[in-house]
A protein has these predicted regions:
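Polyanionic (Asp/Glu-rich) segments that form extended negatively charged tracts
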Residues: 4-236
């Protein structure tokens, strides 16, 4: 980008950078005295706050979030898990949680783009985001609510972890966090695989693109994929 090479973006983050760069170039072109503008930019000061601990950094980020956009429930869940790992598990899972969610956000971008390319109404909806997939995962792996809101999921996870903390069952906190991030990442991966298959498999294309599989069936369908039971011969 800095060399003026605007290559075709491959994911959501790259598309955002691409669009921002185009907008910046457009605005700069309208400035009459570019030298004065450059001198003004050089006077700007950037305040840097360095925090070596990944867990502490995320806790600070959630507390002083000022990016102009509210945190999604998925981001809040990530922060919650890192908080419990950081404070009660000697930071054992901080990096694992961070890596898992980094992958999850990338998988979501791929899922969203694939769904739109396949003309699936569910994924084309502007309101659809990673929180929707978090709901599907919750329905597939928890038994206490089959129509949870994103805020309900966050509260449920917080209640479970708080209960373990109160009883000082730190081994249960570790087991819960480990299982949750493993199944969550696997769930996002499986959904991406299903949509990728719809590009090459006629039956999957018909089910997802033409017939538009009901949103209520996604939790079951994706879980079957994670269990390797949703092969080409399986009848949905």
């Amino acid at each position: 980008l800095l060399n003026g090479e605007l290559r075709n973006p491959e994911n959501k983050s790259q598309r955002a950078l691409y669009d921002a760069m185009k907008e910046i170039k457009l605005r700069i072109d309208t400035i009459e005295n570019k030298l004065d503008f450059l001198k003004a930019i050089e006077k700007l000061e950037v305040m840097e706050f360095v925090e070596d601990s990944e867990g502490d950094a995320i806790r600070i980020f959630q507390t002083v979030n000022d990016r102009g956009k509210a945190l999604s429930n998925t981001e809040k869940i990530k922060s919650l898990l890192i908080y419990f790992s950081n404070k009660y598990l000697q930071k054992k899972y901080d990096d694992k949680i961070n890596d898992a969610f980094s992958n999850i956000f990338e998988l979501y971008d791929d899922i969203k783009q694939a769904g739109e390319n396949l003309n699936i109404t569910l994924f084309k909806n502007k309101e659809f985001n990673e929180d929707n997939i978090m709901r599907y995962h919750f329905i597939a792996y928890f038994n206490d609510n089959y129509d949870p809101t994103p805020s309900y999921i966050l509260k449920h996870l917080k209640d479970v972890l708080t209960e373990f903390r109160t009883s000082q069952a730190y081994d249960k906190i570790e087991k819960f966090i480990s299982n949750y991030i493993q199944t969550l990442e696997s769930f996002f991966t499986s959904l991406k695989k299903i949509l990728s298959r719809a590009n090459t498999n006629e039956k999957y294309f018909k089910i997802f693109s033409i017939l538009q599989l009901s949103a209520t069936l996604y939790p079951l369908t994706v879980k079957l994929e994670t269990l390797d039971k949703l092969d080409e011969n399986y009848k949905i």
